Amino acid sequence: GIGPYVPHKETPFAKMKQGTVRQTLVMISLLRLMFPKALIPSTTSLGTIAADGRERGFMHGANVVMPNLSPVSVRKKYELYDNKICTGEESAQCRGCLDRRAEAFGFQIVVDRGDY
């Protein structure tokens, strides 16, 4: 992925400096310029460190969102970093939330194949 580094408290990297929204948006922008047809995600980690992070990722060239579709009962077992967003929502709730947020920025979520 192309998200910011977000430390997890139970890893050897727990005290490492977290990545920033700005660094991530610059990288997304550069990738979009270099690879116009690439599938570039606006990651959950970007949305975790900034409330509008995923939306800003799209505004800087990202074109993929990766919702958490794992059953709520097992999501804690896949906790890559602390304070991850959307861990308490059911898959359908997450999809509805993503749709509303995308529409607010003039985007539409599709579930088609992403290749060209």
Model-derived features: positions:
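Auxiliary Fe-S-binding modules of radical SAM enzymes
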Residues: 1-116
